[in-house]
Design a protein with these regions (language model features):
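Conserved ABC ATPase signature
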Residues: 100, 128-135
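Catalytic Walker B motif of ABC-type/P-loop ATPase nucleotide-binding domains
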Residues: 153-157
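Helix-to-loop junction immediately C-terminal to a conserved catalytic motif
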Residues: 51
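Hydrophobic anchor residue at the start of the ABC signature
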Residues: 142, 181
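Conserved ABC transporter NBD signature motif
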Residues: 55-70, 74-75
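Q-loop/switch helix immediately C-terminal to the Walker
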Residues: 85, 90-106
Length: 208
């Protein structure tokens, strides 16, 4: 069976330092892969490679058996990538950010007020995001996960600045996505609940 996402022999060099080399990775529908490692080990760099945002120094990445380079548009439509930074428009409100994402990515209609309320943002829907706390901004950014139909999620430290209630809500979202045969790659210092039966981990060693 063709792997959903596969990386073969990946190498990444940043400022003359080899972050990782000859790295192999496979991901199937319904799987959750947690990338672990110390700061500077290359976790974020690996996610950017897997998201097609940068090019490996060696190796290749295949999605559904085909290189990313020959299916960039299809891959972008199949992917929801949320980086370490929130990626929101700080001058816009939470509601306006959701409207922007829905239009830009042709996302289906949903009740934005209800969604933001479920994320603990009730009463803040019309506040410019620059006035929100780091945790509130992160929740606005993560709202995309409840909107997107992309089967592959690549998330860099999604639990950063979230309170326990928001963490539990996000983990529930993970469960729903995996049950629908979606796949997730995540970096996090948060200990993921052991009730993810498909959870796999990959450790990146810090290289001097």
């Amino acid at each position: 069976m063709t792997d959903f996402l596969r990386a073969r022999g990946l190498s990444c060099i940043r400022q003359d330092r080899v972050l990782f080399q000859a790295l192999d990775l496979e991901l199937s529908p319904g799987q959750l892969l947690q990338i672990q490692g110390k700061n500077g080990a290359g976790k974020s760099s690996l996610l950017r490679l897997l998201a097609g945002l940068s090019t490996p120094d060696d190796g290749e990445i295949l999605f559904q058996g085909q290189p990313l380079a020959v299916q960039a548009e299809h891959y972008a439509a199949s992917l929801c990538y949320i980086g370490h930074h929130s990626g929101i428009h700080e001058q816009l409100t939470a509601m306006e950010n959701i409207a922007f994402w829905r239009a830009a990515y042709q996302l289906p209609y949903s009740d934005s007020m209800q969604l933001l309320g479920s994320l603990g943002l009730a009463g803040l829907e019309d506040v410019p995001c620059r006035m929100l706390s780091a945790g509130q901004q992160r929740r606005v950014s993560l709202a995309r996960l409840w909107l997107t139909k992309a089967p592959l999620w690549i998330l860099d430290e999604p639990f950063t600045a979230l309170d326990q209630q928001a963490i539990q809500r996000l983990q529930q979202c993970f469960h729903q996505h995996l049950a629908a045969e979606g796949a997730i790659i995540v970096t996090t210092h948060q200990a993921l609940s052991q009730d993810f039966p498909s959870l796999r981990t990959m450790e990146l060693a810090y290289r001097w």
